[in-house]
Amino acid sequence: MSGLLCGYPMGAKTTSDFLDQGRLSVQEGKYLLAISNHPSPMFVLGYVMAQIALIPSMASPCPLWAVLAALYLPILPISILARCCYHYNRQTREEACPLAAQAAPEKTACFSFDTHMMSCFETMVKIGGYIMLFSILALYLTVFPFQMPPLLRPALLGSVEITTGIQMIASSVPGSMGALLIIGSAAFGGFSGIFQTKSVLKNAGLSIRHYMLWKILHSALSCLIFYVSRYGSLCLLLGVIHLLRRLAFALLRPHNAS
């Protein structure tokens, strides 16, 4: 919930903290990292929708439900797929809980307000620093002297830093293609978000490469769902969701059988 409500990278930070405190097993940490980092609803409602509304030559206004469905529905199939990949289920959680319960008192016996406050300051400085660094890199890409395909430069900007990238996509890519690039960028989180996530994982033993692969998959599914919701019917959108669900369960079934 912290990753969903607070945005990048709070889901990863909460997962890392709980893992360090022994409140989660390693399998739970890997599973939660795959599904807990997302743009917050406030960012989507206040910024993403505002930028989509500014896109020139949009044939029709982009409905809010299509954006929310594209960004948050992929969590369901990715959740099932992550359970399969990391062999996470209720039984393994129950087996890990006694060990976590024994380790937790040793790590959380002493509460220090100063330590927690400094941890918050450190996280804010890291997040702000990476946002500034990658925003500067995005500005360099806008004045890059070499010729690029028309959509490559905006796509690169969105993949570097989502706040700056989304704004530049909205001003340079007309029509529904601009909205599609914005959705893909918001779902991916940008390399700025990846570096922010890496900075808060600390020594939790979680793989940033796995996280990148999950975000790429999430971005692809978000683009697919948004495209279907804009150009297909509601029945087609439900069909795509049902297909993803069946595929995820098909991947999960051999593990359950074993």
Predicted regions and their residues:
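Helix-coil boundary and interhelical linker segments in multi-pass alpha-helical membrane proteins
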Residues: Q51-L64, S172-S176
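C-terminal transmembrane helix pair
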Residues: M42, G46, Y72-L76, S176-A257
